[in-house]
């Protein structure tokens, strides 16, 4: 019998495992309504600040440029977003959520809220609130 104990997971491993688990659950819920986690994130960003350039989306969402382009292409193909020339620089495009995209986002927000509520039931509202606050501080410190 092996008596060596496995090393206790460190913060990076715990955050990575938690991210994978929560992302998988949210992605599964969104997929039931034809959505993706990345598409949801992009639409949320567009709803919060309409008229974002691709560079702004990449920076705000911490996505690689090609991934952001692929996600926006999918949203445009599904009529959930559209592109217009940037009024300040005609060489660039500005991405907007369409009316259909805003409607779909409202449904996706409800699905994500359901996943967040399940997490709150599992851990407790206070602990989830403290976790959100701590993670927000970490992200704000990095930006």
Regions found by a protein language model. Give the residues of each.
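Charged, amphipathic alpha-helical coiled-coil/dimerization segments
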Residues: 73-133
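Short amphipathic alpha-helical segments with heptad-repeat character
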Residues: 12, 16, 20, 62, ...
């Amino acid at each position: 019998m092996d008596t060596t104990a496995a090393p206790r997971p460190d913060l990076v491993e715990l955050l990575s495992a938690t991210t994978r688990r929560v992302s998988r659950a949210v992605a599964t819920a969104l997929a039931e309504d034809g959505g993706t986690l990345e598409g949801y994130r992009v639409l949320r960003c567009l709803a919060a600040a309409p008229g974002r350039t691709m560079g702004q989306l990449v920076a705000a969402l911490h996505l690689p440029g090609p991934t952001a382009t692929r996600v926006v292409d999918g949203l445009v193909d599904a009529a959930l977003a559209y592109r217009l020339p940037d009024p300040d620089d005609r060489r660039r495009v500005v991405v907007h959520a369409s009316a259909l995209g805003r409607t779909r986002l409202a449904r996706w927000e409800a699905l994500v809220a359901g996943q967040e509520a399940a997490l709150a039931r599992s851990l407790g509202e206070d602990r989830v609130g403290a976790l959100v606050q701590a993670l927000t501080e970490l992200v704000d410190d990095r930006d």
